[in-house]
């Protein structure tokens, strides 16, 4: 029986309709084999379980409200699918300390054939030989400390180009969309790190990458829902949102394939990168440690552009919005940069260790606006969490957004206060180092492997924009409302402002670039 492909703007309505279908009757009424009665759970409804409590376009906030009302460890059920929701730093610490391997699976992918988060991807790969091989390759050839030092010049070149684009806009008194310009900077840097060359200006490659990344970002919530309900709906021959997802995935596949072909054609005539050369060697060499396919390479590159590039540019936009809304923080940050870097050169990533307030600003922005608010894993075996038994194959959702705004862990949790990250640890606070209350990039062995690169991108971009420009906005304050419909936390009203070159740095910087 051929699968039925369903696309809809409202996935919850589709699932509700399915619940009343005669075909799905026995599926939805089938009881889980393991009893969850002892685990705290909000009141549920017949058939749909807790679905009615989650009908929100901002799912992380819906889950935060549930935890605030019913507790930090909850059992939720949507139809017959069980979830464990964790919103406590102490519980998260227990899970990632004692059960890290057990929760090292992300479960099934949304759609196997999709380049983004499909069966060929690194992000969605099960914890096993392939994932371990790719993680080692990524760490040793691209994102580890030594590879980041080797690729430092690439990012420095792109930071200068970023500055010059903003300066040109400023001279023309044109406004800029911070997310778009930051995305261009990050994508160009990442592409150069992977391939050793810049995007083709003539072919508008970076614009096409940004467009496709935005399209996939808009589908991120549908990816999440499709993944969560895949096992259940496969019994009915239904595949949620497959058409929409595959259209964008195929476009990305065509673009990445052209990138690979161009790299291969020029391998003999230009300097490549250790990362791409290692990937292609693992693809071609029959005796390699782990034989990968071309789809593996294309999926990995796609995930880099979606995960690293989009998440970093989103974080840059949020941090700049918070800085512009708090003039005293902007001035304090600029003073620190001037005292360490001076006024005759751009801030560089080698300056970051000597800029503690800039580091604090970056961390505070990530605390308030983690690009990915939910950490989703799956228990491979049954275990005990917080004194309660959790059966195997149960989905784990760690609400990092809620944890990083928990008033029990953070004073004035909804306020932008970078100083909180400057406070020295007392003996009492030393104990809190064992509690995970700050995890913008996840935790455990499946945490984001590009977290160090993310800090570099956000730190250098914010540092340059504060060092070199003042910023004009329409109105007194920037609207910090979150956008709906996506899994990433983005701004409902993208930050648009006008850069004004600072006279004290303008001439000296230009003469040195």
Swiss-Prot record:
Residues spanning the membrane: 9-29
Task of the protein: Cleaves the arabidiol side chain at C15 to form 14-apo-arabidiol and a side-chain fragment. Involved in the biosynthesis of the volatile homoterpene (E)-4,8-dimethyl-1,3,7-nonatriene (DMNT) in roots. Involved in the production of DMNT by degrading the triterpene arabidiol. May be involved in the defense again the fungal root pathogen Pythium irregulare by producing DMNT.
GO MF annotation: an example: iron ion binding
Pfam families according to UniProt: p450
First-tier enzyme category under EC: oxidoreductase
Entry cofactors: heme
Gene Ontology biological process: defense response to fungus; terpene biosynthetic process
Keyword Transmembrane helix: yes
One term under GO cellular component: membrane
InterPro entries: Cyt_P450, Cyt_P450_CS, Cyt_P450_E_grp-I, Cyt_P450_sf, Plant_metabolite_P450s
Assigned EC number: 1.14.-.-
UniProt: heme binding residues: 448
Family as reported in the entry's similarity comment: Belongs to the cytochrome P450 family.
Membrane topology value: Single-pass membrane protein
Subcellular compartments: Membrane
Name of the protein this chain belongs to: Cytochrome P450 705A1
Tissues in which the UniProt entry reports expression: Expressed in root stele, root cortex, root epidermis, root pericycle of the root hair zone, and quiescent center at the root meristematic zone.
Induction line: Induced by jasmonate.
Cytoplasm listed as a keyword: no
Gene expressing this chain: CYP705A1
Keyword entries, A-Z: Heme, Iron, Membrane, Metal-binding, Monooxygenase, Oxidoreductase, Plant defense, Transmembrane, Transmembrane helix
